[in-house]
Structure formats: structure tokens, C-alpha cells
Amino acid sequence: EAEPRLWAVWMHRKGNVHDVALTNGVGPRLHHVGLWVRGELDVIRACDVLATTGWRGALERGPGRHGISNAFFLYLRDPDGHRVELFTGDYQTLDPDFEPIGWKLDDPQRQTLWGHPAPRSWFEEGSPFVGVEPREPLMPVRPVVAR
């Protein structure tokens, strides 16, 4: 890009890829909260528990693997509608001198290395902040969505 622009931010407090993610789109809104689990089987077990306890509809995306973080992921909605990511297998970011890795927005593998593309809700829905009116983004969004 001739003029690099910030499209998303992943923030962490404990050296993993992220705990909170903010992305471009109508907002400001919280996209999701990330919760690290020990391994891939914990993510699969969460799918089994949700499906067998009447919460299958809470599954929004996944399981799959992200290109950016290499994380094995599952996204679900909590009872209040907030998006939660269960993930594992990401890399550590403990070194403050670590050079950020740049990804092109038109690279579909940055979002999903393998697995189904994100649903439209992934780009159009988020948790609003109290007292802050969401507005259209300054940078247009052209998401790759599941059909």
C-alpha cells in the first residue's frame, strides 16, 4: 500500500496474540473477547457441549485456523450477544522488540487459513459501547464472507 492504514488492533495483557480485538467497520464497537484454551480438543469439546445443551445456535464461526495468528478458533455468542473466541495454538508475543507482521487486506488466508469464511454477522455486528454512537468507517470495508 502506498499509504499504510490501520484496519484492526489486537491487544494483549499476557503475551498471547490477543485478549481483545477491535476491527474496522461501523463503530466503535467491540468485535470480540478472546479466551485461550489449552488445546484443540478443548475447542472441539466446547462445540460438543454447546450442541448437546441446546446452545448450538450460539456457534457463529469455526472451528478453523487463522492465518494471522495460526490460532485454532471457535467463535460463539454469549447469552447477551457478545462475541467470544475460544482459541489455542497461537504464538507468543513476549518480546517488546518483536516486529509486527503485515498482512494485505485482500489476502483471504489472513483471516482464515482453513475453514469456512466468516459469516456476514462477523463484519456487521459487534457490541456497542455505552454512550458512544456508532458511525460509518472512514476506510471502506470489502469483506470476504461465507455464502
PLM features: residue spans?
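Long C-terminal interaction/binding lobes of large macromolecular proteins
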Residues: 27
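A short secondary-structure junction signal
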Residues: 21-24, 45-46
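Short beta-strand micro-motifs in enzyme catalytic cores
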Residues: 7-9, 31, 70-74
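Short glycine-biased active-site loop of nucleotidyltransferases that positions the nucleotide triphosphate
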Residues: 12, 23, 75
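Core segments of cupin and vicinal oxygen chelate
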Residues: 1-17
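Solvent-exposed, charged amphipathic helical/linker segments at domain boundaries
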Residues: 19-22, 30
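Short, charged/polar, Gly/Pro-enriched secondary-structure boundary elements
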Residues: 17-20, 82
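Vicinal oxygen chelate
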Residues: 35-84, 88-147
